[in-house]
From Swiss-Prot:
Name the record gives this protein: L-aspartate oxidase 2-a, chloroplastic
Matching PANTHER family: L-ASPARTATE OXIDASE, L-ASPARTATE OXIDASE, CHLOROPLASTIC
Pfam families, per the entry: FAD_binding_2, Succ_DH_flav_C
GO cellular component, one term: chloroplast
Cofactor binding notes: Binds 1 FAD per subunit.
Gene ablation phenotype (knockout): Reduced alkaloids and nicotin levels associated with a lower putrescine production. Occasionally, an early senescence and a lower viability of the older leaves is observed.
Residues flagged as site, Important in orienting the L-aspartate substrate: E195
Annotated source species: Nicotiana tabacum (Common tobacco)
Binding sites annotated in the UniProt record for FAD: 94-97, 116, 123-130, 294, 454, 470-471
Compartments, as annotated in UniProt: Plastid, Chloroplast
Keywords: Alkaloid metabolism, Chloroplast, FAD, Flavoprotein, Oxidoreductase, Plastid, Pyridine nucleotide biosynthesis, Transit peptide
Gene: AO-2A
Pathway(s) it belongs to: Alkaloid biosynthesis; nicotine biosynthesis; Cofactor biosynthesis; NAD(+) biosynthesis; iminoaspartate from L-aspartate (oxidase route): step 1/1
Cofactor(s) demanded: FAD
C-alpha cells in the first residue's frame, strides 16, 4: 500500500510504501491526494492508533557526529548559548492545552512556553460557554458519548470519545483544585448549563467568561512555577527536524521575537504543539488575531500527518455588528454569542420576527452547530438579509444578566439591551475540527512531537464538534501526553552542538524599511484576498466547481505573492510576522480545499450541493500524508531537514 501525499497544489504523489499488518484492512486513495482511511468494519481509531505506534516503535536517536558533548537527564535550569535556548520540554501555545501540560511536565524538567503574543491571548481566553462533563446524577458517560457521536455525524473515533467523556470530570476537578472558580447553584453544587446538541445539562461554566477564568487560573500557576519560562511575543516559525531512515525526529523549534526581531532557537527533548486553530483563513472569525494556522502549517511542513481539514466549524451566532444601534469600528475578530444563550431558551428569528429553526430540525435552536449554521445561511440567502435575530428577552432580566454578563455589557456598549431587544447574529468561522493527526496520548508520526487542543485531530469531534467539547478535549489530551513525554525525556539527550545543524532564519533587515513596508502592505492585501476567496468559495455550503475555482485562485495568488516578495529582495530564509503568517494561511487554506474536494458526500460541517447526502461507505477520516515536494515557499521548511 502506498501512502497518499498532498502537496500545496493538492496533487497526488507517491513515495516509499508503508506496509501494514494484514488485519488492519485495506486503505485506499481518493482524488486530490487524500487517503480516506480503512474498510468499514475496522474502527476509525484502531488503524490510526496502530499507525502511530508502528511508526514510533523503533525509536533511534539520530547520529550525525560522534564527538558531541551531550547532556543526559533533565536540565536543572534554562540553559542558553547565544541565541539558542535548551529545555527538556518546549510548549508552543499558551492556551488551556499548553499551560495544563506545562504545569505537569515542569515537575520533571525545564519548560519553555513559547507564545505568539501576550500569554493570555489565546482561543481559550475567548471561550464563553464552558466545559462539558458528566456531573449530574441523571446524566451518564454513555449519554455524553452518544451526543458527541451524533453531533460528529458518526465520524468520531469511539475509543477517543469514551476516553474524553470518562476522564473529563476528573480533569475539571483538577482545575478547581488549582483555583479555577466556576458557577454554583443554590444547592452548592456546580451549576450545569445546557447547550445545543446536549441531551442533559452538563456544561460547567463561569458565567459567560469560562475560558477567561480558566486562563487566569492556569497562568497564575505557570508564572509561579520556577521550572517554567514563558517567552511572550515569540512567533514559532518551523520545527527543527532530522530524518533517520523513514523516521522524522523533532528537536525543537525556531521562533522570532516579534519585538526585537531576534531569531531564537529552542532545542528540546520533547515538543508539545498547542497553538490553536486557523480561523483567520476567513474574513470573519471568533478567533483572536493569533489564530492563523501556524501550528498546522508547521507540522505539515515537518511531514506530520494531517486529517479532516474539510470540517471547519462556523459558529451560528457571532454578533452582527451592522445590526447594532451603534455600529462599532472594525474588529479584528467577531464577538461570540455563546451557545448557552440558545441552551437557556434563546429563539432565532428572521427580520420579520418569524421563528425558522423548527422548519429545519426537530431540535430547533438546540440542534448541533452545523445544522443551525446552515439553517441561518439558508435564511440569509433566500431572504437577501445579512443577519438574523437571537432573542432571550422573554427570560427574567436577572437571570439573563447573571448568566450572560459579558454579552449583555458588550451589546449595551453599542446601544442594545439584550433583556429587551433581540441580538443580531450571523455565522462566523469558529473552530477547526481537523488538524495534526494524534493518537490517544497526543503522539504524532513525528518522534518527539506531541499535539493537544484545536491544532490536533484526535478523532473526538468527527465531522462536527459538539458544543463545549473543545476545552474538555484540550484538558484530557494535555494530561494524557504528559507520561509519554516524560518517558521520552528520560531516554533522550540534549546536545549542545545541535544548534548548528540547521541554517538560521534571519529577519529581513537588509532589504530596508521602505521596501519592507511595501512588502507588508502587499501581504495584508493578499491576506484579505485569500480570506475573501475562502468565504465565497469554501464557506458553509460548497460545490465542486467552486472548490476547484478556489484551489486554482489560491495557488495563483500564492505564486503572485511569493513572486512579489522575491522581486523585492526577500530571501527564502527570511522571516517576519506578516510574511510567515501569510504562508501559514496559504498552507491551511490549501489543506482545507484539498480535503473538501476529496469528500464526495455531505457530512457534518462539510456540505456540498453536488453530493448532498451522507454516504455510509464514505464514513472515513480524510488523511493528508506529507509531501516530499516543495512546490512553494509556503509549503517547505525554511531550513532543510538534516538527514542522518
Amino acid at each position: 500500500m502506498a501512502t497518499g501525499i498532498a502537496s500545496g497544489s493538492g496533487q497526488l504523489h507517491l513515495r516509499k510504501p508503508v506496509y501494514w499488518r494484514s488485519s488492519y484492512g485495506k486503505a485506499h486513495c481518493h482524488s486530490n491526494a487524500i487517503l480516506n482511511g480503512m474498510q468499514n468494519q475496522i474502527p476509525w481509531s484502531y488503524w490510526v492508533s496502530k499507525f502511530l505506534r508502528v511508526h514510533r516503535s523503533n525509536y533511534s536517536q539520530c547520529q550525525v557526529k560522534t564527538n558531541w558533548k551531550s547532556h543526559t537527564g533533565t536540565i536543572n535550569s534554562c540553559q542558553r548559548d547565544g541565541s539558542t535556548r535548551y529545555f527538556d520540554f518546549a510548549v508552543i501555545g499558551s492556551g488551556i492545552a499548553g499551560l495544563r501540560y506545562a504545569l505537569e511536565v515542569a515537575k520533571h524538567g525545564t519548560v519553555a512556553v513559547i507564545t505568539k503574543a501576550e500569554p493570555h491571548e489565546s482561543n481559550t481566553n475567548y471561550a464563553q460557554g464552558g466545559v462539558s462533563a458528566v456531573f449530574c446524577p441523571m446524566d451518564s458517560v454513555e449519554s455524553h458519548m452518544q451526543d458527541t457521536i451524533v453531533a460528529g455525524a458518526y465520524l468520531c473515533d469511539e475509543e477517543t470519545v469514551r476516553v474524553v467523556c470518562t476522564e473529563g470530570p476528573e480533569r475539571i476537578r483538577e482545575l478547581i483544585a488549582m483555583g479555577a472558580s466556576f458557577d454554583h447553584g443554590e444547592d452548592g453544587n456546580l451549576h450545569l448549563a445546557r447547550e445545543g446538541g446536549h441531551s442533559h445539562r452538563r456544561i460547567v461554566h463561569a458565567a459567560d467568561m469560562t475560558g477567561r477564568e480558566i486562563e487566569r487560573a492556569l497562568l497564575e500557576a505557570v508564572f509561579k512555577h520556577p521550572n517554567i519560562h514563558v517567552f511572550q511575543h515569540h512567533f514559532a516559525i518551523d520545527f527543527l527536524t532530522t530524518q533517520d531512515g523513514s523516521d522524522i525526529i523533532c528537536h525543537g523549534v525556531d521562533a522570532i521575537n516579534t519585538e526585537t526581531q531576534e531569531v531564537i532557537r529552542f532545542i528540546s527533548k520533547v515538543t508539545l504543539l498547542a497553538s490553536g486553530g486557523a480561523g483567520h483563513i476567513y474574513p470573519s472569525t471568533t478567533n483572536p488575531p493569533v489564530a492563523t494556522g501556524d501550528g498546522m502549517a508547521m507540522a505539515h511542513r515537518a511531514q506530520a500527518v494531517i486529517s479532516n481539514m474539510e470540517f471547519v466549524q462556523f459558529h451560528p451566532t457571532a454578533l452582527a455588528d451592522e445590526g447594532l444601534p451603534n455600529r462599532p469600528s472594525a474588529r479584528e475578530n467577531a464577538f461570540l454569542i455563546t451557545e448557552a444563550v440558545r441552551g437557556d431558551g434563546g429563539i432565532l428569528y428572521n427580520l420579520d420576527m418569524e421563528r425558522f429553526m423548527p422548519m429545519y430540525d426537530k431540535r430547533a435552536e438546540l440542534a448541533p452547530r452545523d445544522v443551525v449554521a446552515r439553517s441561518i445561511d439558508d435564511q440569509l440567502k433566500k431572504r437577501g438579509e445579512k443577519y438574523v435575530l437571537l432573542d432571550i428577552s422573554h427570560k427574567p432580566r436577572e437571570k439573563v444578566l447573571s448568566h450572560f454578563p459579558n454579552i449583555a455589557a458588550e451589546c449595551l456598549r453599542h446601544g442594545l439591551d439584550i433583556t429587551q431587544q433581540p441580538i443580531p447574529v450571523v455565522p462566523a468561522a469558529h473552530y477547526m475540527c481537523g488538524g495534526v493527526r494524534a493518537g490517544l496520548e497526543g503522539e504524532t508520526n513525528v518522534q518527539g512531537l506531541y499535539v493537544a487542543g484545536e491544532v490536533a485531530c484526535t478523532g473526538l469531534h468527527g465531522a462536527n464538534r459538539l458544543a463545549s467539547n473543545s476545552l474538555l478535549e484540550a484538558l484530557v489530551f494535555a494530561r494524557r501526553a504528559v507520561q509519554p513525554s516524560i518517558d521520552h525525556v528520560n531516554v533522550s539527550r540534549i546536545d549542545h552542538c545541535a544548534s548548528s545543524w540547521w541554517p538560521r532564519p534571519v529577519a529581513p533587515v537588509v532589504i530596508g524599511d521602505t521596501v519592507l513596508n511595501k512588502v507588508i502592505r502587499r501581504t495584508r492585501e493578499v491576506r484579505k484576498e485569500l480570506q475573501s476567496i475562502m468565504w465565497e468559495y469554501v464557506g458553509i455550503v460548497r460545490s465542486t466547481s467552486r472548490l476547484t475555482a478556489a484551489e486554482k485562485r489560491i495557488n495563483e495568488l500564492e505564486l503572485e505573492w511569493e513572486t512579489y516578495l522575491f522581486q523585492h529582495g526577500w530571501e527564502p530564509t527570511m522571516v517576519g510576522l506578516e510574511a510567515c503568517e501569510m504562508r501559514n494561511l496559504f498552507c491551511c487554506a490549501n489543506l482545507v480545499v484539498s480535503s473538501a474536494l476529496s469528500r464526495h458526500e455531505s457530512r457534518g460541517l462539510h456540505y456540498t450541493i453536488d453530493f448532498p447526502h451522507v454516504v455510509e461507505s464514505k464514513r472515513l477520516p480524510t488523511i493528508i500524508f506529507p509531501s516530499q515536494r516543495n512546490s512553494s515557499w509556503s509549503s517547505r521548511q525554511l531550513h532543510r531537514q538534516q538527514i542522518c
